[in-house]
Amino acid sequence: MITQFEFNKRGGVGTISVTANIAPKLCSEFQKNSTSKNDENLAKAKELDDILQPVHTAMFVESNPSPVKYAAKLMNLCDDEVRLPLVKVTEETKIIIKKAIESAKLI
């Protein structure tokens, strides 16, 4: 699987990111550094990518937008209500999301 870091490092530009809804600063900093040709910036981008990967993964354990809504709830940004046919994330997924956003120091 090619990550956003690898895509940008190979000359790709831009991203579509669910994670940016809950980690806009990290995602913005990652994007800025990962599109640089400077080795120092690319090293910083790799560090940020390592921080963000568990969050990216957690946002797709269940159907979007339920995981990001739950993460936003943990961050006191909104509630985790979703409309049918969507459902809230399971208790198992809540644990995965919480661990991921804690590891990224978002809460």
Summary of predicted features, one role per range:
Residues 2-3:
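Short acidic active-site motifs
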